[in-house]
Amino acid sequence: YAFWDALDRHVVRLGRMGIQIDLILFHPYDRWGFDGMGHEKDLQYLDYLLRRLSAYPHIWWSLANEYELTKRTGQEWDAIEAFVAEHDPYGHLLSCHNIFKIWDANRPLTTHASIQSKDMNRLGDWCRRYNKPVMLDECAYEGNLEHFWGCITGEEMSRRFWKAVCSGAYCTHGETFYSDDDILWWARGGVLKGTSPERIAFCRKIIESLPGHLEGEPSFLHSLIPLAKMGEAERNARIAERIDSELLRTVVTVFCNSGPDAESFAYSETAYYAHIGTDCYLHFYDTRPAARDTLQLPEDRKYTIQLIDTWNMTMETVAEGVSGTYVARLPSRENM
């Protein structure tokens, strides 16, 4: 039981640090035999694990890391998910992490989406598709490896967090810098070397100060994607009903008739705008060095406009008592 005793110590230590644990139950890169026991022994292992660890309040269940690479059938995954949910008396969060094929978070026993992807532009779609919390738990790592997945800057990592929260989703951080001792933080922890953690903490502080959960707003072109998938008669009726401008009607019609090319164009122009009802609006301009933005705010509310520099970690009030149409002046810098 030395393995389990060591695991207990780590779980307790992380809990004392205020850290939630997404515990991976099966692993395709396993070197200790857990991935080749067979289904019956898989369930025996899970039975013991759940009896031993379920009482910890800060633990989640990740059925697998990159589940498609393990030696299990779809039916076996169904059984594993059902077994974990049935034998966990405390109802911990439960999901499964993909490499290519995203686990279907619409499954009744799955509590949230656990997604590996570098395509930030689809986060809003996933939030709307699943109507559950979406955790982008592998968006690449801040570091300097030769691999695509381990070689983004701290600035890019910070941007990905803001893109996630402005899509209504969540994001996780990891770090993969080469070091003299040849130990990656991603694998063994230690001292963080990157520039994104303090910026992520700044992001978290702002998001936690808001009056509720942010919901992403699809851009205009993005909102046309469902329209393009309708039948022609229904689509034309919607266009005639909702759009007065002849030019805009032409643009929408051409978009809807342009197939996958138009959809790709729409995703390439994803706008990271979010709101909490009419209480709060958050616009992240990403790499766009905009000089201004025209905001359309409710006429019956009064708003304070604050300019956030996500990289320099500053927040400045630039206007108060604003409603209706307002032209916000921006500093023509990225990361605002």
What is the meaning of each model-derived region?
Residues 91, 107-183, 195:
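Catalytic-core region of carbohydrate-active enzymes that cleave or remodel glycosidic bonds
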Residues 144, 157-319, 329-336:
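Aromatic- and carboxylate-lined catalytic core of secreted/periplasmic carbohydrate-active enzymes
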